Amino acid sequence: MKIGIIKETKTPVDNRVALTPEQVATLNKQYPNHRIVVQSSDIRAFTDDEYREKGVEIVDNLSDCDILFGIKEANIESLIPNKHYVFFGHIAKMQAYNRHLLQAMIEKGITFSDYEYLVDDNKERVCAFGWWAGVVGVYYTLRGYGLRTKSYYLPKPDITFTLEKLLNNLSAISLPAVKILITGNGRVSHGAQYVLNYIKARQLSENEFLSTENVNSISYTVAKAESLVKKNNNETFDSLDFKNNPQNYHSDFGRWAKSTDILICAHFWTAKAPVYLTSEDLQDAKLRIRMIGDVTCDIMGSIHSTLRSSLTLIHTTIIIQLQKKKSRHSLV
């Protein structure tokens, strides 16, 4: 079998890659009956020469490969008919913005495997960006808040950024006394919590967060699904039922919207689940939220300020009150 690592073709560009030069070289040696080649790319985090130095073949054409691995959605024009592609497709939730990609793959006779739905024998996902998305998501959100308020400055991350550099940047500034809400308690949420704990943000209980008007230092809480929704007919919340039948629940986010300065969305959402912030909610003069870091980035999903994906890893929204009306601006 011949396996190809594709050049990332989505706009905006993504410099991540499925396998490093060392990993490709190891796999080629360990499985001599199979071969992995890498499509030439000038945007990848690893250069072509770094792969060549490990004895990996760099090619321009992948048409003789059996399986093609990428990271983000492949550009429709780059799709090779009758191949098996593996990447994060963002189509399983029937996302409207990728409908044309799905149609193109069907028309071209392509077999598609989505990393997001690969699980082990225990039904646990084997591949996820989660934790790192939460880490970077918090940084971008706090960076956006600083730009909005002009109270501090954080540099925009680039390819040279490491976790240590990110944490050092946050530790070097004086962060304001704001209340941060993290929704969800999965990998993304844990990454966000890691950063906030590192910078010694105070963790509040849900009751403390909702009952405390102002805080003396940067503070946060984590709201799980049972605190964000209520079951219709006032029935008891059931996590398995919510997962299988989210349409039987409605949003209880209003109380959080009145108590939160910065919202970091780290929850899982599907089209049948409740919307937490509608367009009408965003116009409400009682809305306290001034910054949204939507790490989930579901377009017009649970947060209706997310109109498109941004040039960064998350979609950041600032909400400005002008004569009791709200306008939304994306920061990149």
PLM region descriptions:
Residues K10-S41, Y153-S259:
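Glycine-rich phosphate/diphosphate-binding loop of Rossmann-like nucleotide-binding domains
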Residues T111-N168, M291, T296-V332:
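Adenosine-phosphate binding glycine-rich loop
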Residues T9, S40-I43, E73, Y117-D120, ...:
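Short, ordered loop/turn segments at secondary-structure junctions
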Residues I67-T149:
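Phosphate/diphosphate ligand-binding glycine-rich loop within oxidoreductases
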Residues E50-D64, V222-L287:
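A structured beta-alpha segment of the ubiquitous adenosine-cofactor-binding alpha/beta core
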Residues P81-E116, I262-L322:
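ADP-ribose/adenylate-binding Rossmann-like module
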